[in-house]
Design a protein with these regions (language model features):
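Bacterial N-terminal signal peptides that target proteins for export
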Residues: 1-9
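Short, well-ordered, aromatic-rich surface patches in folded extracellular/luminal domains
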Residues: 21-50, 54, 111-279
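Short beta-strand segments
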Residues: 60-62, 89-91, 140-145
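A short, structured loop/turn motif at beta-sheet edges
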Residues: 66-67, 94-98, 135-141
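A short-motif feature that recognizes glycine-rich, charge-decorated loops
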Residues: 73-113
Length: 279
């Protein structure tokens, strides 16, 4: 698990609200999304060496929308096996805070063209993940990718500015007073081949009947390969189907194997975010 994933679940020490405020704002006027479901800012981790389906079940460290809705990962118990899916928590921030975030993004250089900030210095981490910061402003989507941003101490002024921006975003959770569990209207369900090599104790494996009507072997559509993971397939589950099986999905763990006839797969799921429609 990379450092930004740890930050996302609240492992960064809490700091005073004043320290979390977005100061030194860029005075240049910038338009931003204001409607529900319109993404304003997102921070997520991609890449890195992870067990099968860990990348698929992960959710962004934070997603902030134009109406002030903020979604963050719910805390996952530090036990093995862990849940097969990742839950979310929700809270809201006011329009003034959103404006400050947009201005602070400008100070950090996040309103410009897409760019990649590579690692520098002797502490290079070959298999670290990359932090992806997406900011939507002036009707455009601006993406900054910083390799290994939280795997080593940020050394350059730019990397320090990016790390500080991310930390202040994540700290919004520590000052929120209206945090609730988020019930998604749709989830992405992933399946992949089962490999006992990824289970430290085969006795921890539990097998359950495949709960869906669609055949397990041809579930959904193939997920584009990333060169590291096993072959993965995914389909969106929503509506009555999700209402029927939501509780069943929450009982599955990372060592649950779903079975249909001679087919066996591991399963992972994650909530679809308000700006997402597909896996």
């Amino acid at each position: 698990m990379t450092a930004i994933r740890n930050v996302a679940v609240g492992l960064v020490p809490a700091i005073a609200l004043a320290a979390c405020s977005f100061e030194a704002a860029d005075p240049t006027p910038v338009s931003r999304p204001t409607a529900p479901g319109e993404l304003l800012v997102r921070v997520e981790t991609v890449g890195g060496l992870l067990p099968p389906l860990d990348a698929q079940r992960s959710v962004p460290a934070i997603s902030i929308y134009g109406d002030g809705l903020v979604l963050v990962p719910a805390t996952v118990p530090d036990i093995f096996p862990g849940p097969a899916g990742q839950e979310l928590e929700a809270f809201h921030v006011g329009a003034g805070v959103l404006d400050e975030i947009v201005a602070a993004a400008g100070v950090a250089g996040l309103h410009g063209p897409e760019r990649r900030v590579e690692q520098e210095g002797p502490e290079f981490v070959a298999d670290g993940g990359a932090t992806v910061i997406t900011v939507v402003s002036n009707g455009q989507r601006h993406v900054t990718v910083a390799d290994g941003l939280f795997d080593v101490e940020p050394g350059t002024p730019l990397r320090r500015a990016l790390a500080d921006f991310v930390r202040r975003l994540v700290e919004l959770r520590n000052t929120a007073t209206d945090v609730v569990s988020y019930e998604p209207s749709a989830v992405a369900v992933f399946v992949a081949a089962f490999d006992e090599a990824f289970v430290p104790d085969p006795q921890m494996v539990t097998r359950v009947e495949w709960p869906f009507a669609d055949p397990l072997a041809t579930w959904g559509e193939p997920v584009p390969p990333d060169g590291l993971s096993v072959d993965v397939r995914c389909r969106v589950v929503d509506g009555d189907e999700l209402d029927l099986l939501r509780d069943a999905l929450r009982t599955l763990t990372t060592t649950t194997v779903v079975v249909q006839d001679s087919e066996e797969r591991i399963l992972a799921w994650r909530p679809l975010l308000p700006d997402e429609a597909n896996c």
